[in-house]
């Protein structure tokens, strides 16, 4: 089964659950993620993906290491997560999703919370 088909199945499994963005901060704390020194967060109604990709390209061209998360994907789930302008590999995507899903099995999270 392709990663996209597998993740589409996961979306259906979790689609009944309510989205609560406040939970995300607690999830990040539980994962003990140490954020990089600088983070750029882009908000608003229109143009977030284009702006994020433009900034990402400028930073990369100036020798910065970059990570980019955008949502929703246009074609494949892999395009949501980029490291130095390259989409995350299928194997990595599935590995990390399963790891997070297992860690938070008792949390009753929706797909967005698990994937973000």
Predicted regions and their residues:
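Short active-site-proximal "capping" loops at secondary-structure junctions
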Residues: 46-48, 73-74
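ATP-dependent carboxylate-amine ligase catalytic core
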Residues: 21, 28, 32-35, 61-116
């Amino acid at each position: 089964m392709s990663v996209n088909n597998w993740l589409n199945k996961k979306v259906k499994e979790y689609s009944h659950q309510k989205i609560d963005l406040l939970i995300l901060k607690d999830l990040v704390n539980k994962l003990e993620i140490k954020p990089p020194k600088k983070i750029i967060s882009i908000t608003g109604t229109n143009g977030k993906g284009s702006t994020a990709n433009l900034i990402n390209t400028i930073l990369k061209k100036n020798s910065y290491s970059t990570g980019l998360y955008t949502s929703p994907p246009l074609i494949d789930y892999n395009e949501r997560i980029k490291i130095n302008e390259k989409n995350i590999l299928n194997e990595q995507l599935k590995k990390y999703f399963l790891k997070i899903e297992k860690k938070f099995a008792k949390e009753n999270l929706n797909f967005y919370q698990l994937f973000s």
